[in-house]
Each structure stands twice: as structure tokens, then as C-alpha cells.
């Protein structure tokens, strides 16, 4: 039997994976949908490419801004909680040790062992112990706004670049069908891959992402076709 210390689980990477896949999916769906809508309105190839480029830039900036603000708010909350915990340790160190002891008792340790663990951990790193076991914070899980913003913008841009590249290279008569096929295949692969890495059902994950992507493309194509007819 393999030692427990060597067991590997997928939970650690689920957060960043979800954010990356979400950004790429957004890039593919929003940009391909916009390009299809513009193309369905029978506009020029130049306008199609300009619309796709604008969608890539605007979407990436929007994702970066939203992610930065959101994660920075989380970082501010974490910093405030740590500052409060630091102040409480300075005022009532013994009380904080009792609080940590109670946490370990609730987790299943007997009182004597819980006291020993709390005393040793607080002697080594009092604030870190409370941050981890009371607040649920660790160095690995701390919010990093700039990193999150860059990752979100990068994943969106990577996804958006795919339909834009197809639009630039595909012959005009086959532009729409080429974008649909490439985008749906990409969504199918992304959905299945993220489900597999996350330990979920691959088929269900792939089909779910592909279905909603197809729905978005169909809706914007319909709007573009109607606009082209009315124009």
C-alpha cells in the first residue's frame, strides 16, 4: 500500500485551474460569438477582424480589472484579520492560546495533547498558527491581486485569440462554419480536460461547456442575421 504521505489529491490546483479555464472559455465564447454576430450581418472582413480584436482587448482588460479589484478586496480583508489577530496576541496571549487549544479539541485531540500542541506552535509562530488554524489562511492561499489579474487576462486573451486567428485565416465563404467548428472543439477539449484534472465526470463537463458555448454563438448569430436583414 502506498504511504499516505505520498498520496496526491487534485484539490490544491482546482482554484487556479478553474480560473484559467473560465478565462479561456470566456475568451472563446465571447469573441467567437461577437465575430459570428458581425459576420452574420454581412459586414466586411476588415470590420470582422476589427470587432474580434476589440473584443479580445476589451475582454482581457475587463477580466483583469474585475479580478484585481475582487482579489485585492480579499487581500485587504485578510490583512485586516491578521492585524486584529496580532493585536489580540499582544493583549491576551494566554487567552489566544486557550482559543487555539479549543480549536484542536474540536478537531478531535484530547485536552492534554491540544494544550501541548497549542503551546508549542505558539512558541514557534503564534500569529502563523492562528492565521492557519483560526482564520484558515496560509502563505499558499493568500490573495495575490496582480498575479490573479494577469492570469485572468492572459487566459482570456489566449482563448479569444483562437477564433480571431481562424477569422483571419479562413476564406470568407467558410469563415462562420470554421469559427463554429474550431470554437466548439476547443470548448469540448477544455471542458473535458478541466473535468478530468478536477476529478469530475469528463463527458458531462465537456458537454456542459460546449452546450452553453453553442447556445451563445447561435444567439449572437441570430441577432447579427436579423440586423443584417434590417440594415
Annotate the PLM regions:
Residues 1-18, 71-153:
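Cytosol/matrix-facing amphipathic helices and coiled-coil assembly/linker segments
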Residues 1-70:
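Internal alpha-helical transmembrane segments
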Residues 12-23, 45-53, 113, 144-150, ...:
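The feature identifies polytopic integral membrane transport proteins across all domains of life
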Residues 58, 62, 159, 163, ...:
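Alpha-helical transmembrane segments of multipass membrane proteins
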Residues 173-185:
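Structural signature of hydrophobic alpha-helical transmembrane segments
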Residues 189-214:
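Interfacial loop-to-transmembrane junctions
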Residues 221-231:
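Juxtamembrane boundary at the C-terminal end of a transmembrane helix
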